[in-house]
Amino acid sequence: MSDSGTDLSTATSDDGVRRGEQFRDDLRCAPGRVLPAEVLGELTSLSTSRSVIAVSRTLLVILAVVIATTLVVTGSVAASQWSWLWVIIPAIFIVATQQHALFVLAHEAAHYRLFPNRRVNDLIGRLLAASVGLSMCSYRVVHRLHHNHLYGDQDPDIALHGGYPRGKAYLVRKLVADVFGLTAWKTYRYFLGSPTANVNTGVAQRPLDDTLPALRQAARNDRWLVAGVQLGLPVCIVMLFGWEGFAMYVLLWIVPAITVLQAILRVRAICEHGAPSGYDSAMQAARTTIVGPVLRFALFPHHVNYHIEHHLYPAVPQYNLARLHAELTQRGILSAAEVRSFGATWRRVFAPPAMS
């Protein structure tokens, strides 16, 4: 175990860097400017009850929206009315925000931070991810490269958040493509760990090759779970609720996942890393976004807006990130860091492209 509680593999690469399960604490900001061991011990402590509440709350919101919308739609259709169209649009948006929340919880599981018991952590994390078509085990491998090589040649996330500011027109085009479902296939390739090429160097990236054999096999096996869930769920819905139920499943689950969810993922990724003030450490290359309750619900569920803190100490579970932010702020560690409001971030992102 590392000091922060993150599991380390025993295998090392040729340059001595550990591989496999490790998510390194990014403390390049200033040597020695770290939290006391006793404080860090409290912050990295896992709570089963708090994770159960987080998972349950997200699932209950989804269930409530789906049931309420289904009742309105079926009632309106039976009465030959079209008023249900005004209910579908906000329902799709709300479901997409909660699909995003499920992903954030699967992200916690990828970091081994959802539940103290490893088997429970991985089982719940895999199921949450599979429900929206993602592989938690594949993402675990891919995401480790993002943490350990932030804005480096091996960072697989640069294609999504790199290169900003690019001007307003560029991002508007991207978001329109997201909302029309034109980019979903790229998202699912990424979360399944598919080979890709670095957008800057053109060098092929095969994230599942850069890990331990056991984790590589787990990632490949997890794809079968994802396929099983994605094929089995609609079959079960048809058997239980008929083709009307299947139509609602497509409308309230598939449509949000391939449209609005894609835009949410892009916006959050850009808030976290777009148009940074520097690239030398997570203090500048990552960003903490200060938001109110509306944006927290829409874009930053489960404290995911505290992104600098997450990069500095990835072993801290989501429900302790606000306290971690307070501890770092009190010690002056975030005084020169990328901590901005949502509006300030988007003024940077929407700035004209930098001249070469």
Predicted ranges, named:
Residues 1-96, 131-251, 318-356:
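Non-catalytic, topology-defining segments of multipass membrane proteins
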Residues 65, 110, 114-115, 280, ...:
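Active-site-flanking alpha-helical
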Residues 94-106, 135-139, 183-187, 253-281:
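Transmembrane alpha-helical segments that form the membrane-embedded catalytic/substrate-channel core
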Residues 101-111, 139-151, 268-275, 300-316:
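Histidine-centered catalytic micro-motifs
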Residues 104-124, 151-162:
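Aspartate-rich (DDxxD/NDxxD/DxxxD) Mg2+/diphosphate-binding motifs
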Residues 118-128, 279-292:
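Membrane-cytosol interface motif
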Residues 120, 124, 168, 172, ...:
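Alpha-helical membrane-protein architecture signal
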Residues 127, 210-213, 286-303:
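Cytosolic juxtamembrane regulatory segments of multi-pass membrane proteins
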